[in-house]
Amino acid sequence: LKCNKLIPLAYKTCPAGKNLCYKMFMVSNKTVPVKRGCIDVCPKNSLVLKYVCCNTDRCN
């Protein structure tokens, strides 16, 4: 699986066991992701952070 880094022009290949891509937003500003990468389990959203997870190459 390949996931985009913070700047989507760059991406990385996920290590074994991390089979989801994610992007994280501040709830107050959903237009600009603050973090992207590989993850094993999609985190729950909080009052401050929103996570979007997916499982295809560079979907984040």
From Swiss-Prot:
Keywords per UniProt: Cardiotoxin, Cytolysis, Disulfide bond, Membrane, Secreted, Target cell membrane, Target membrane, Toxin
Subcellular location: Secreted; Target cell membrane
GO molecular function terms noted in the UniProt entry: toxin activity
Tissue occurrence: Expressed by the venom gland.
S-S bonds: C3-C21, C14-C38, C42-C53, C54-C59
Keyword Membrane among UniProt keywords: yes
Domain of life according to the entry: Eukaryota
GO annotation, biological process: killing of cells of another organism
Main location as per UniProt: secreted
Key word Disulfide bond present: yes
Function of the molecule: Shows cytolytic activity on many different cells by forming pore in lipid membranes. In vivo, increases heart rate or kills the animal by cardiac arrest. In addition, it binds to heparin with high affinity, interacts with Kv channel-interacting protein 1 (KCNIP1) in a calcium-independent manner, and binds to integrin alpha-V/beta-3 (ITGAV/ITGB3) with moderate affinity.
Quaternary data: Monomer in solution; Homodimer and oligomer in the presence of negatively charged lipids forming a pore with a size ranging between 20 and 30 Angstroms.
Family in the record: Belongs to the three-finger toxin family. Short-chain subfamily. Type IA cytotoxin sub-subfamily.
Protein name: Cytotoxin 3
Species in which this protein is naturally found: Naja naja (Indian cobra)
Upper taxonomic lineage: Eukaryota, Metazoa, Chordata, Craniata, Vertebrata
